[in-house]
């Protein structure tokens, strides 16, 4: 049962455990029966999150701090994984299991099918460097990483499109 002092709304911080992945790659956690989608969350993580969006049946949150790392976690190969490939910190084998669960869920919950067989998810021959589409963006304002020195020229940029950013 939710403690009466916890009221889920925009701006509230919560400590929760990510239970699974939702379609699209967000972590899924529940506070009682209330669903909280956690950006960049992976199953098994205990995290402190900030609610940034609240709707009638769910909320969306971003991780402030990982309190306990998931046993399913792995080291990301890319320094910018949190922008372009959020699931790089989830082991590849677990990614395949999650994809299969999502297919089963879609057939059962959305399609209404009960009698079917999934023959597993085929793994890619190469887990990395297989993208066949890239979106580039020109911008008058370069995105500056926190690790870059102050005073870096930010007047022009050509690079990969950052999801959710349109400037």
Per-segment meaning from a language model:
Residues 1-167:
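Non-catalytic accessory regions of SAM-dependent methyltransferases
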């Amino acid at each position: 049962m939710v403690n009466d002092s916890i009221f889920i709304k925009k701006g509230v911080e919560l400590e929760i455990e990510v239970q699974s992945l939702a379609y699209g790659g967000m972590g899924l956690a529940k506070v009682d029966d209330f669903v909280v989608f956690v950006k960049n969350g992976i199953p098994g993580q205990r995290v402190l999150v900030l609610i940034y969006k609240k709707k009638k049946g769910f909320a969306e949150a971003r991780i402030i701090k990982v309190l306990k790392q998931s046993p399913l976690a792995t080291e990301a190969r890319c320094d910018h994984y949190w922008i372009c490939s959020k699931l790089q910190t989830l082991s590849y084998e677990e990614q395949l299991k999650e994809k299969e669960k999502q297919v089963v869920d879609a057939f059962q919950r959305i399609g209404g099918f009960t009698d079917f067989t999934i023959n597993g998810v085929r793994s890619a021959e190469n887990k990395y460097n297989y993208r066949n589409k890239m979106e580039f963006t020109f911008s008058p304002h370069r995105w500056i990483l926190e690790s870059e020195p102050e005073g870096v020229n930010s007047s022009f940029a050509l690079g990969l499109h950052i999801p959710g950013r349109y400037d």
